[in-house]
Structure formats: C-alpha cells, structure tokens
Amino acid sequence: MKYDTSELCDIYQEDVNVVEPLFSNFGGRASFGGQIITVKCFEDNGLLYDLLEQNGRGRVLVVDGGGSVRRALVDAELTRLAVQNEWEGLVIYGAVRQVDDLEELDIGIQAMAAIPVGAAGEGIGESDVRVNFGGVTFFSGDHLYADNTGIILSEDPLDIE
C-alpha cells in the first residue's frame, strides 16, 4: 500500500505526531506503514536479528540506536532477513550500511545516515520499551506511516482508503 504522509497530516492533523525531519529513505519502498515494535540498542544489532526472524507482516521495527552514526545497525544481510519475513519497514535512529544493496530490497528503510562500519552483534538492548527521538515518543503497538516526505505516528491505525 502507498502512503502519503502529507495527505494523512491534512486529514488527521489532530491525531498524529510528526517526527522531526532527521531521516532519509534507504530502502526499496518509497512509503510504508504498520504497527510498530520498539527496540533500544546502542551500536549493537544482535537483538534485531532475533526480532526480524519473526513474522513482520503489517509491522514496522522502530530502533532507537541513540542517534549514533559511528556504527551501522542495519546492513544488507539483516534487511534480507526482514524482507524474507515480510516486514513492512524499519526506522533506524542511527546508521545503515551497504546502501546500494538496501535500495534494491522491497522494504521501507528510514535512517539518519550511512557508514561502512558495522555494529557489534552481542544482543545487548531491550525490545517493547518506550523510545523517544525526533520529538516523538514511540510505544510498541502504535502505528507509523512513512514516505520520502516524512514519518508520522498515531496511537490508532488511520483509515487510509
């Protein structure tokens, strides 16, 4: 499904929170949306592997990487796992790498920057916790919509059709 965050903001202005414009699109989908699962991890993506092995149909993984752009939390291997398990998208408050590969994969990815250095894989972090970045607080179960214009968040699903 295609999402237009500008139109959604016009229709649901009182019902959505708009994430500050810190992110760029690195994935093969220009827009994506779904119910979110939150993760908090710093320069370590081991927990992301565990979560992205789950069925992701209709879901978006929101990762609070502390805004660090020293190490990439997401690479092509991890993204292929997400695609295989039908995740709608990833929002990374941090960095990604292997961007030429990422843009070829059928998934939405919004992240702050790209860097070639990979993250540790020890599995340090927490999931299903409140995370806050970009002027918005994210809770697992909220609904996120993203496109090349921006990212918006709603407690309830928006009537898109």
UniProtKB/Swiss-Prot annotation:
- Biological process according to GO: negative regulation of RNA catabolic process
Alphabetical keyword list: Cytoplasm
The answer to keyword Cytoplasm applying to this record is yes
Record localization: Cytoplasm
Keyword Nuclease among UniProt keywords: no
UniProt cross-references to Gene3D superfamilies, sorted A to Z: Ribonuclease E inhibitor RraA/RraA-like (3.50.30.40)
GO cellular component terms, alphabetically, are: cytosol
Q: Which GO terms describe its molecular function?
A: endoribonuclease inhibitor activity; enzyme binding
Assembly and partners? Homotrimer. Binds to both RNA-binding sites in the C-terminal region of Rne and to RhlB.
Q: Which family does it belong to?
A: Belongs to the RraA family.
Q: What does this protein do?
A: Globally modulates RNA abundance by binding to RNase E (Rne) and regulating its endonucleolytic activity. Can modulate Rne action in a substrate-dependent manner by altering the composition of the degradosome. Modulates RNA-binding and helicase activities of the degradosome.
Q: What is this protein called?
A: Regulator of ribonuclease activity A
Q: Which organism is it from?
A: Escherichia fergusonii (strain ATCC 35469 / DSM 13698 / CCUG 18766 / IAM 14443 / JCM 21226 / LMG 7866 / NBRC 102419 / NCTC 12128 / CDC 0568-73)
Q: What is the lineage of its organism?
A: Bacteria, Pseudomonadati, Pseudomonadota, Gammaproteobacteria, Enterobacterales
Protein encoded by which gene:
rraA
